[in-house]
Amino acid sequence: RIDEEHDLKERYGLKKVGGMREIWREKSALRRHRNQAMKLIGRVDSTEGHYSKEKEQLLNSLTKKGLLQSGADVGDVLEINVEHMLSRRLQSVVYYKGLAPSMRAARNLIVHGHICIGDQRMTVPGYHVLKEEEDSLRYSENSPFLDPEHPFRKELETLRYQEDEEEELEEDSSEKEES
């Protein structure tokens, strides 16, 4: 378990000291969602009344958070894991959208106020980004990184381009090995 948590801490760029607490927080939230889903699955009459409404609210909430696809069923809640939860954090979404070269750099950009959602400047790397907020994620208005000519942005584009080329080379070599 400890090795697994250290691996998650490295992969998602969590704090070096106290990063385990962030993982435990996500595991705790996941456990609450799963317990609620298991309670609803165990009910015989979950199709009408209060339980139907509770089930619908749970599914809508998790869909809005980006943890489930629309049209999912209560059983799908049990398939969510900690990595799904960690990948919905602001820090991870900033990295996946290409605004930072690494998870740690994404955390640094957020903490120093260079990232905003809409007009709201965000400084909490652990904030869970809703699906509808993903499109409005960008650099802050007062951030020097907003300028596409900034050396950081140029270096970021170069790094992304190199990663894409490396992936293409790996795909080509694996295709040749299969032939």
Give the role of each language-model region.
Residues 1-97, 116, 120-179:
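Ferredoxin-like alpha/beta domains used as RNA- or RNAP-binding modules
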Residues 100-104, 112:
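Beta-rich strand-turn-strand
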Residues 108:
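DNA-binding alpha-helical recognition surfaces that contact promoter or target DNA
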